């Protein structure tokens, strides 16, 4: 750094070297302001999407779930089927459920 400064002082003189250093600091200042504006805009964008999309979406999803799937059915026979008959661990189920064919009164799996 001092080598560059000494070279500039020799070739350009002290006044132009001071001007170049000043212009460099102004450029750094403007770059910082541009980055600050960019970060502020990105922050406002994230805050907008979080406030108007993410939170209402999560609240809406919770509302729909609580008033549909999350609601207790108060139908014991249906709840017994849901709990006891359907496979509990997907494709790894060793005991597949028996479903009753209502019209033929026959069990098949």
Swiss-Prot record:
Residues 1-11 are virion surface. Its main location: host cell. GO terms for biological process: disruption of cellular anatomical structure in another organism; viral budding from Golgi membrane. GO terms for cellular component: host cell Golgi membrane; membrane. Residues 33-109 are intravirion. It comes from the Viruses. The keyword Membrane applies. It is a single-pass type III membrane protein. The chain crosses the membrane at residues 12-32. Residues 89-109 are annotated as: Disordered. InterPro entries: E_protein_CoV (IPR003873), IBV_3C (IPR005296). It is found in: Host Golgi apparatus membrane. Residues 90-109 have a biased composition (Polar residues). Belongs to the gammacoronaviruses E protein family. Homooligomer. Interacts with the M membrane protein in the budding compartment of the host cell, which is located between endoplasmic reticulum and the Golgi complex. The cytoplasmic tails of both proteins are important for this function. Interacts with Nucleoprotein. Plays a central role in virus morphogenesis and assembly. Acts as a viroporin and self-assembles in host membranes forming pentameric protein-lipid pores that allow ion transport. Also plays a role in the induction of apoptosis. This is Envelope small membrane protein.
């Amino acid at each position: 750094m001092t080598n560059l400064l000494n070279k500039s002082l020799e070739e350009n003189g002290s006044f132009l070297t001071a001007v170049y250093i000043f212009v460099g600091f102004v450029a750094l200042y403007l770059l910082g302001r541009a980055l600050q504006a960019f970060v502020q805009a990105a922050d406002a964008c994230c805050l907008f999407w979080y406030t108007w999309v993410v939170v209402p979406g999560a609240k809406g999803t919770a509302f729909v779930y609580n008033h549909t799937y999350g609601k207790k059915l108060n139908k014991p026979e249906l709840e017994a089927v849901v709990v006891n008959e359907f496979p509990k661990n997907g494709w790894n189920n060793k005991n597949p459920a028996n479903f009753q064919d209502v019209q033929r009164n026959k069990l098949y799996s």
